[in-house]
Structures are given as C-alpha cells and as structure tokens.
Amino acid sequence: MAAKREDCVLVTDDDERIAGIFTAKDLAFRVVGAGLKANNVTIAEIMTKNPLCAKTDTSATDALDLMVRKGFRHLPVMDENHDISGILDITKCFYDAMEKLERAYSSSKKLYDALEGVQAELGSSQPQQVIQYVEAVRQRMSGPTLESVLNGLPPTTVSVRTSVKEAAQLMRENHTTALLVQDQGQITGIFTSKDVVLRVIAAGLDPATCSVIRVMTPHPDFAPLDMSIQQALRKMHDGHYLNLPVMNKESDEIVGMVDVLKLTYATLDQVCLPNL
C-alpha cells in the first residue's frame, strides 16, 4: 500500500480469485485502533471477506447505484471468467463526471455569451432552450453548500502529544477517518487513517509511542461554510487530500469536517444532467 500509495488492496485465494478486500480504514480501526500489533495480524483477520463485485458488462449507472446504496468507496470488477479485471473508486468516477460537467458549463457559457453578443448587435432573441440549458448547468455547478451536509457536530480533535494508538481509537469510536490536531488551542495539523498506514505502520513506527505531531499533515486547508460542494471537491482533488475542515468565517470557528465520500454522495444527482 505504501509503495503504490494506495488505500485499498484486493486479496486473492490460491486460484487467484477475489477472497477479500481491505483498506487503510480497516488497518487503522481493526489493528491500531483495536490495540493490536500489525506484525501479529494476518490480512485474513481484518479483511472484508467475499466482497460484492461488479462485472465488466455492468453499466456504470448500476455500479454507481450499488456503491451508493451499500456505502462502498471501492468496488472490485470481474470479467466473465470471474477473474479480476480492476477496481472502481467512486470518488475517481465522480471526478471524471465532475470534469465533464465543468467542460459542459464552459462550452455552454461560451455559446451563451456569443448569443448575447448577437442579441446586442441584431436585437434578436436568444433561443430559450440554450438559456435553460446553461442555467441548468450553472445551478448544478453552484449546487448546495458545505453547510448543507454538516451534521452539526464539531470535528474530533487531539493534541500534538496524543499517541497514534490513542488517535486511531478515537477514530474508531467516533466513526471518522480524520482528526484535527491542536496545539495550545490552535489547529496545527490533520491526521488520517491513511497516515496511520503510510507514515506509521509502513515506516515501522510503534503506534503506542509515536505522537501524532510526527506523522500528521501540518497546516491543513480549510473551507468556508458557504463554499459549494463542487468547489470543495475541486479543491480536494487539486490538493490531493480526502478530508476538509469547514470554518465559520463570522465566528472564526471550525464547525465540522467533510470527506470526499460524503460530498460525492451528496452531489451524485447533480451530474445526471441529460446530454452532457
């Protein structure tokens, strides 16, 4: 996982058929968060056995629907011989759709602006269908804000001196894959389940004695409450991170944390605009 910087691995049996799947979250929750030593735990003990799979001829819509209904981020794909063909990542699928939406908006906006110029010169009316189309795309591009997806609970925080083991236990207890790190009341970093795997387990550090300040990401980005979900996803995609703290600019307080999976689920219906 560390070498490939992946957070999901498929497990095969002796016949090279899919036997299970495990993720960075599984390692953080089921190993470190459970107080176990990674060297003493086998993959079979923590993996999800016999995961649901899609087939290569499964439609993208059906695969996406399955992932949303089951709460999966990753979905293995098999061919007609039940051999592994690949793995779908719902967030990457969504980014592709988001870029498609952005391109549609850009090209439609150019057409809209051109028609405005024609109207100004000739006094002709713009085709109503074009106006409606551009407005529909614009609304999907702006979309709901981050405030609409927050649950009202503040993000879980730890101090810079908290051990990785304690941090992983807090993740498990609070059903979150990211914690904010505080030093003297100020947010100085963010620590995630992926950090547990790549920066602690893979590096051979002891979670019980390693403090989060050694392995956290310092000075995380923040987003305002009124940022659109689409803008937040673009920010996360460009910054190569999966979690984003949300700040109320009026009170200067951090009021929540969103992750890429939650935002993807919240906006899937927005990329279903026909004929994009």
PLM feature spans:
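Tandem CBS (Cystathionine beta-synthase) repeat/Bateman regulatory domains
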Residues: 1-276
